Amino acid sequence: MSTDAELQTISGLSVASKSAPSTQTEGVTASGKVESTTNAEEATSDVEEEENPLVVAARDGNTAEVKRLCESGSYSVLDTAEDGVTALHWAAVNNRISTCQYLVEQGAVVDAKGGQLNGTPLHWACRRGLVYIVHYLIQNGADPLRSDVQGYNALHLATHSSNVMLLVYLLHQGLPVDCQDPNGRTALHWAAYQGDALSVDVLLRWGSDVKITDTQGFLPLHWGIVNGSRNSLARLIEEGSDMYAKSSDGKTPHVMAAEMNTTAQLEGALDDCGRFPDGSQKTKYFDARTTNLLCFFTPFILILLGLVLCTFCGPIFGIILTVATLFGSIKLLKTLVLPSLYNGHAALLKSPFQAGIFTGSAFWVTVKYLTSVLPATFASHPILNFFFASIFGLAMYCFFRCMSMDPGYIPKLSGITEQKEVIETLIERGEFDTRHFCFVTYVRKPLRSKFCRQSKRVVARFDHFCPWVWNAIGVRNHRMFVLYVLFLQIGIPLWLALNSAYFGELLEIKRWDPLEFYLVIWISLQLIWITFLSFVQIFQICRSLTTSEAVNLQKYGYMGADDYSSVPLDHSAATASAKSVMNAHGHAAKSPCFSSVLKLLGVDQFVATAGEAIKHRDNRSWKEKNPTDSGAGTNCFDFWFPNGKFDLLAVFEAGKGGGAIGGHAVDYYKLWDFPDVSPNQQQTNNRSTREDGEALLAESQV
């Protein structure tokens, strides 16, 4: 069945399958073997292909053999099969960059049309998502706006490939984002139909129109409903898709969803966009600032209310009433407050509610300490009070600094021209993939950086997003965050010791303070996640790992996840862009509710980290696989004193990207390659090498 025939069938809703259309691709593997496909692109017979030495050599990337055959005079780069297919077609579709370069240099026609689809080498490469081949052909005159017999240009075919990096590249070449095929479908229609949320997002941010209809009257939203990708549907709805638009046969998105059995996905997407299941918009009662303030200060009231209920109703009924009040308050927040700014099932976790839990707890600790504990214990335990007050004050200082500062955002580029220059540089280095380029912000990603979904920015040396401080943890505030956690780890036991003395004083005078007693229990519970977090952070610092890197290591191993790289094996810089654990990305499937609880308490990462510690305790190959690990001592010194000087006051300072790896000063905003931290190299590069970066670190202090 052809692509258009398949779409016609689906538009009539007479099929049950919701898989993406079989966009006709050349049936040749990278190894040179012909695949069994349903398309007829390769019109040349199998026998002829196998017997044509030039085709075989071009397909296999044997440039030396191609050169020998052409120079012998027996074959020419202009030779074509009966259907017009050339050696350049086969080299292009099999990602043979060196062979393509030789053929083009010898005069091969870059826009030669061939095959039953009458496609050019560029079309063949686009169907496979081969960025480097596409780049080379366009640089040498290939026309990306030329269409094949089905009316698809390079942008349509790139969308069919689902390689988001190729889509980004072509858009930066100036191709119209909403060019339509003969059936009126834009690249956005195709991306939505395929359920390709990444491509949908890229096209929408580039300005693709969600209101364009095809010849059947289908919006991209209609085609998205056929596939049922919740993320794709949410983005289309966010950008203004008409929830009540009818197709030519009179079907609205809701009717189509019911017939295609994707109603749950559509309603989930509507919820993610702050809409009711019928598509109407939820009322927004507050502005962004008021919404955040309400979410932040609500825990202050809930904590006090819980303490009062336990005090006057007893522990059992008090806890029951407190839990009921908590759920009621959260329901109220989700109904009246959160829709003004946050939507979806994780709306509460996106808000500053958890930061409010910590701050509210600290606030009531301060109130009770100043009004009850301090007056009763200062005379008998002055030193203990001094240490607690100092540690608690430092913890709160680090908390607010960590919460309010820039964690290390990579600066945005000024415009498309600068973005295009970055893309060209990465292609030249063989690094145009999601490890080195952010397709959301269009910035080059330094090593160890990552895109933060909450802030929508790339963060240098990204560790994680912490809901307890409501900020990303990156190169600038990571030390402050670890200090905050460690001060809490020390301060809470000191506070418990003070309360032990306080209750001893009360017993002597036959009095009791139930409010303080329940506050002690509440704060003691906070010590659980703080202990887990302290262990994880200290362990990872000793291993020179960030939390993001550790999580990706546990999910995908050292090779990481798919990075949408299509770098040819014979690219001049292919070996320089070997995979590493540092910038992998992806998602793991877990039970949403249980997983959220584990993440909030830090249990999941604690268990995983403990497992890694046991697994690698005697594994010396770890250092060889982790390019930043120079041993626990050096790793810790690099983290706490990146300027190479043992300066305790400098620990509290935040830089602007300066750091150290294995004794080498680095700028995490421009870390394109890891320094050599191998044992032999370290012997020849002593601590004095840090002096080279002291100027950078000194300038970056704030």
Curated annotation (Swiss-Prot):
Polar residues compositional bias, start-end: 1-40
* Gene Ontology CC terms: early endosome membrane; Golgi membrane
Keyword Acetylation in record: no
The positions flagged as active site in the entry are 466 (s-palmitoyl cysteine intermediate)
- Membrane topology, as annotated: Multi-pass membrane protein
Parts of the chain that traverse the membrane: 300-320, 321-341, 355-375, 380-400, 480-500, 519-539
Q: Which reaction does it catalyse?
A: L-cysteinyl-[protein] + hexadecanoyl-CoA = S-hexadecanoyl-L-cysteinyl-[protein] + CoA
> Where is the protein localized?
Early endosome membrane; Golgi apparatus membrane
| Segments on the Lumenal side according to the record's topology features | 376-379, 501-518
Q: Which superkingdom heads the taxonomic lineage of this protein's source?
A: Eukaryota
EC number(s): the record gives: 2.3.1.225
Topological domains annotated Cytoplasmic: 1-299, 342-354, 401-479, 540-702
Gene3D superfamilies recorded for this chain? Ankyrin repeat-containing domain
**UniProt ANK repeat ranges:** 49-80, 83-112, 117-147, 150-179, 183-212, 216-245
MF terms (GO), sorted A to Z: protein-cysteine S-palmitoyltransferase activity
The family database entries (Pfam families) matched by this protein are listed as: Ank, Ank_2, DHHC
Keywords from the named record: Acyltransferase, ANK repeat, Endosome, Golgi apparatus, Lipoprotein, Membrane, Palmitate, Repeat, Transferase, Transmembrane, Transmembrane helix
> Annotated region Disordered: where?
1-51, 679-702
Main location as per UniProt: membrane
Q: In UniProt terms, what function does this protein have?
A: Palmitoyltransferase specific for casein kinase 1.
Q: Which family does it belong to?
A: Belongs to the DHHC palmitoyltransferase family. AKR/ZDHHC17 subfamily.
Domain free text: The DHHC domain is required for palmitoyltransferase activity.
- Give the protein name, as stated in the record: Palmitoyltransferase AKR1
